[in-house]
Amino acid sequence: MACARPLISVYSEKGESSGKNVTLPAVFKAPIRPDIVNFVHTNLRKNNRQPYAVSELAGHQTSAESWGTGRAVARIPRVRGGGTHRSGQGAFGNMCRGGRMFAPTKTWRRWHRRVNTTQKRYAICSALAASALPALVMSKGHRIEEVPELPLVVEDKVEGYKKTKEAVLLLKKLKAWNDIKKVYASQRMRAGKGKMRNRRRIQRRGPCVIYNEDNGIVKAFRNIPGITLLNVTKLNILKLAPGGHVGRFCIWTESAFRKLDDLYGTWRKAASLKSNYNLPMHKMLNTDLSRILKSPEIQRALRAPRKKIHRRVLKKNPLKNLRIMLKLNPYAKTMRRNTILRQARNHKLRVERAAAALAAKSDPKEAPAKKKPVVGKKKKPVVGRKAAAAKKPAADKKAADKRAGPEDKKPAA
């Protein structure tokens, strides 16, 4: 399937190229902004809502009064009287059966939304540009595998069709009937209460046929399920991007396709059928980033690539890792060896001393004589300061004996 060419082929009612070509309008090259399309769709869809509200009297059409305190029941207003189940039941409150709702809805809610005209046009331009890309159209679920070209343009003769069988034959010749068969297969019953409100069945969307003049084309196509018909001067974002998602499959008549440049203009001239409107421009004229980065202007401003790879090395604890410690301190191995030898030598000395002490204990002759303990008045061993004090007089006596000379020992005359 061909797409995004400067020239678009025009197909006849037989499904073959008629030989005529149309220049691709500039609107199909507009920037695709799904965010703007979704925002505009959401706000415009709100304008179709019908105001609704509950009755102002709902929940208040009874006589009720609170019983007050002291009755071991809630202070909610209660229905008066007796003789029925209703008497004594709570009323008015949103937590009561038969009471009003919380914040009853009002019809003066802000139902409608105003959207800027330029923003609406931007959304339509994005939706049209997306309809020319097969990938986006197929992602939306349209069966366009056999369609010869996108965007698909047919001759103006189609605008004069008045019979549905002619429209069906055209779709089959253009290989677009697969999209209609998808719609038939998707018809099903709606879930929810819409079944009771004249909205029983739902189905998928089919092609969108866009024409310039209605010479019977609306009557011919309107009864085919899934088909949407739009006049090129009244394009609607709700139809071009159902659900706020771009990528609708569009079939154009030749005159409608040629009119797009007058409606939306190009980047060289403004739109002639709209006042003061210019086609939105891309923020990037060239979206090929690889081509931009490889351009000589960019390459001149860039530094040369660093081809040396600096890998992060895991830091290891040298106190736990001997190999790292030897890198930092080669003498650590000798220190560790000396420590081991010293510990072995000290252990050997301790063992020898313990053996000698054990041998001395086992031999009683060689055992040294024990000193007699100092005994007090009550024949109990004296400990601490008392023992030291008891020993001092003996020492003083010995010192006095030593100081006494031979002259002291002479007898008295």
Curated annotation (Swiss-Prot):
Main location (coarse class): cytoplasm
Chain spans, region Disordered: 355-413
Residues bearing PTM Citrulline: 300
Modified residues (Omega-N-methylarginine): 97
Positions bearing N-acetylalanine: 2
Localization per Swiss-Prot or TrEMBL: Cytoplasm
Residue positions where Phosphoserine is found in the record: 290, 295, 362
Ribosomal protein listed as a keyword: yes
An example molecular function term from Gene Ontology annotations: structural constituent of ribosome
Subunit structure: Component of the large ribosomal subunit. May bind IPO9 with low affinity. Interacts with RBM3.
Record protein name field: Large ribosomal subunit protein uL4
Organism: Oryctolagus cuniculus (Rabbit)
